[in-house]
Structures are given as C-alpha cells and as structure tokens.
Amino acid sequence: MNQVEMTEFPVGKPQEALYGVASTPDGALWFTLAKGNAIGRLSPDGAVSRFPLPHTDGQPTTITCGPDGRPWFTLSSANAIGRLAPDGALRMFELPRPASRPFGIAGGHDGCLWFAEMAGDRIGRITIDGDIEEYDLPVKGGYPSCMAAGRDGLMWFTLNQAGAVGSISATAAPRIFPLGAADAAPVGIASDAQGALWIAQAGNGAIVRFDAGGRITEFPLHSRAARPHAIAADAAGNLWFTEWGANRIGRISEAGDLAGYELAAPGSEPHGIAIDPHGCVWAALETGRLVRLQASPRD
C-alpha cells in the first residue's frame, strides 16, 4: 500500500465544533460549524470562506453535495434543511413538524435529498425546490441518524438507539433490519460498488457489512472504544471512517482488511468524512481543522 500523507487545514476554532464535511464537483470542501452557527468553504486554492446562518443556535450538523451540485445541510436545533449557492446565497426550508431534529442527509436516486429526523421517528424527503414529504417509521425512539443511497435504488438509514438499519423509497414502505448487537449504536452508513452497505457502530467499536442478501458481517476494530462515527466509500473499493474515540482515521477494504492512521494532535475528535473528486479523503476535526489523506489504491 502506498504511504498515506496527511495534511491539516485550519478552518475554524475549537469552540465552534467543526462537525460535517462534504465535497462538491468543483473540488471545494464545505463544512459545518455546529456551535459556530455557520457553514464554511475551503476552496481548491486553500482559501477559507464563511457563511453565517440566521439563527442564534441553528446547530448545523451533517452536510452533503446535492443532485444540483450544491451543499445541503441539516440544522438540528433550527428544525430546518439549508442549501447554499456558490456565491453564498442561502435558502432555508423549515420542517413541517416542530422539534424533529434533522441530522443525516444524503442525495437519492430520485434527484431529491433524504434526511433523518432523530426526534421525530421519521425519514424526510425534500425536492430541489424545497417541497418536503415525511414518512413515519415503525420504530419509536429508534433515533434515525445517517442516510445513504443504496445500489438497489432505496435509501438506507441507521437507527442509533434501535441497533438497526432501515430502507425506504418514495414508493416502498420503510423496512427495519436489526444488526444483532444490543450495544451497536450505528451511526454512519455508506454503500459500496457491489451493493453492500457498510455501517459504523459507535457503541461496540466495529464496522459492519450488510450485503444485498441481508447477511451481516462484523469487523471489530483495534479497540472497542474507538467509536467509529462517519463512513464514506472511495472509487478503489475502500471504506474510510472516523474513529472519534481513538483519534484516528480508519480504512477497511471490501475484503475486510483494516488499517488506521493516527491524527497528529491528541484529542482531535474526528467526525464527518468525505471523498473529493481526486480521491483524497477529508475528515472534519472538532479542533477546527480539516485533515486530508491521499487515498491509497486497493491492496
């Protein structure tokens, strides 16, 4: 495997709680400052821009590149979905029901954005124009968390407090699939090129592969206290994930081979993760830095 080079870019202050990160087709990195009440942009030339949000405490958390090539993000405390244009023009879409606490968000095959409502026990769908539909889940108190588009045309999500994943579409009712471990606490979810889903289980320090046939394979990490959080797939067949509790970025191949990369500063608290158009891996560190790793080819 080629040597992985890690480079950090200061983009915020530790007290601003840098959280989510997403890449757009122009090579820019967009990120959320959960306590800084702002969205930031790191351009390919290294310039940092900041876009304040019109809330005292909107708590922007997860961010993704939408089907329109623009950054879309959830505001957990403001109960809204936001979208930014490259020039900083902001649109906000308030959710129909209060205190839903939207969290995970991902683009779907239908050209819409799908999001998880942690406190609402619902999955939401928003069009590019801002029309919102919501779908009740059959599990109460499950804490729907992160979203991913599956190769099967469905949207998949984690249920953090139910130890399960679920699937849904605009025409298919939600289905729930327990992961088997009572302490799993799944958070991040991603789909690989073979159609399998990969889940970061923060509760028991493992990465799980959930294949198209429903078979579950668990890959324990070096420490059960690693607290894997976000996960993303690269084009080479690797899954990259943040280890919030272990101060590392992890990598797992489709065959289950694991590797880990220590962050330079102790207590960096990595959260969100994304892959840019050049195949580099980016992670958001709560210390106010983005770290870039040059993605290695498959072993």
Swiss-Prot record:
Its EC number is 4.2.99.-. Substrate binds at H229. The active site is at H271 (proton acceptor). Belongs to the Vgb family. Mg(2+) binds at E269, E286. Inactivates the type B streptogramin antibiotics by linearizing the lactone ring at the ester linkage, generating a free phenylglycine carboxylate and converting the threonyl moiety into 2-amino-butenoic acid. Monomer. One of its GO terms (cellular component) is outer membrane-bounded periplasmic space. InterPro entries: Streptogrm_lyase, Vgb, WD40/YVTN_repeat-like_dom_sf. It comes from the Bacteria. Keywords: Antibiotic resistance, Lyase, Magnesium, Metal-binding. One of its GO terms (molecular function) is magnesium ion binding. GO terms for biological process: antibiotic catabolic process; response to antibiotic. It comes from Bordetella parapertussis (strain 12822 / ATCC BAA-587 / NCTC 13253). This is Virginiamycin B lyase. The keyword Metal-binding applies. Coiled coil: none annotated. Its cofactor is Mg(2+).
